Amino acid sequence: MYTTEEKARIRWACRRGMLELDVVVMPFFEECFEKLSEQEQRDFVSLLECDDPDLFTWVMGHGRSENLGHASMVDKIVAHNLSKVR
């Protein structure tokens, strides 16, 4: 769905202003993005447009996005990172 150039832009957008987000978002992109459905990929790209404080709150489980696509994607990101810890 995305061209190589578009994926490079998405990869760049995964670089956040907070190290705490970098260590969860970038590995998810690198290891899971290609396996996502087209809709999930769009949700992921849309999620990257959110502000870091909001994304951090959602990833830490202190809140939940009202956008169902974003909430679902955060769940996938968190689950992916938890699977690496176990």
Swiss-Prot record:
UniProt keyword annotation of Chaperone present: yes
* Keywords for the protein's UniProt record, in alphabetical order: Chaperone, Cytoplasm
Could you say which residues form the signal peptide? none
Q: What's one Pfam family here?
A: Sdh5
State the superkingdom: Bacteria
Where primarily located?
A: cytoplasm
Q: Which GO terms describe its biological process?
A: succinate metabolic process
| Location within or outside the cell | Cytoplasm
Give GO cellular component annotations, separated by semicolons.
cytoplasm
Q: What protein family does this chain belong to?
A: Belongs to the SdhE FAD assembly factor family.
Function, as annotated, reads: An FAD assembly protein, which accelerates covalent attachment of the cofactor into other proteins. Plays an essential role in the assembly of succinate dehydrogenase (SDH, respiratory complex II), an enzyme complex that is a component of both the tricarboxylic acid cycle and the electron transport chain, and which couples the oxidation of succinate to fumarate with the reduction of ubiquinone (coenzyme Q) to ubiquinol. Required for flavinylation (covalent attachment of FAD) of the flavoprotein subunit SdhA of SDH and other flavinylated proteins as well.
Spell out the protein name for this chain. Answer: FAD assembly factor SdhE
Q: Which gene encodes it?
A: sdhE
